[in-house]
Amino acid sequence: MSRVSTSMTVNASLAEVWDYYFDPEGWPAWVDGFGRVESSTGYPEAGGSLRWVSGRAGRGEVTERVLEHEPRRVHRVAFQDPETEGELNVAFAIEGDGTLVTQELDYRLRRGGPLAKLTDRLFIRSQMRGSLARSLGHLKLEVEEVAAAGAQPL
């Protein structure tokens, strides 16, 4: 398995960040490559599942199964798409007047081959890291805008 991670401090309360993170109406604005929800059963609670599809240039159909959900602390899912599978762990913590959000992605390529490890190391890992960073960057912008306006999340 390969691992990538990124962290970002959002200038908003833990409650605001947590609530926005799990609001599906906001996902198109911040989840990298997100298209639409196909189905959701019990999500985001432990044991729940989510199936979503990306936009044209994205990952295709993505399925998630919630492994752990501790309100305002951690959310961990097992995921699978046509090219990869693994786990995404998201941790939330108060940091000063804001909220530190950390995403750790453990993944493996579903299709092997003699050059799979090299391809991952040279190309795919940086794309995965970039996707996490884009998502958190957009989450930060969206939540801070909502918090600054004094409005409730979507």
Segments from the language model and where they lie:
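Short beta-strand segments that buttress and anchor functional surface loops
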Residues: 49-55, 75-82
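Beta-strand/loop substructures that line and gate deep hydrophobic ligand-binding cavities in soluble
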Residues: 78-134, 141, 150
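Hydrophobic ligand-binding cavity/cleft-lining segments
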Residues: 1-42, 154
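Short, highly charged C-terminal tails/helix-capping segments
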Residues: 34, 38-39, 137-154
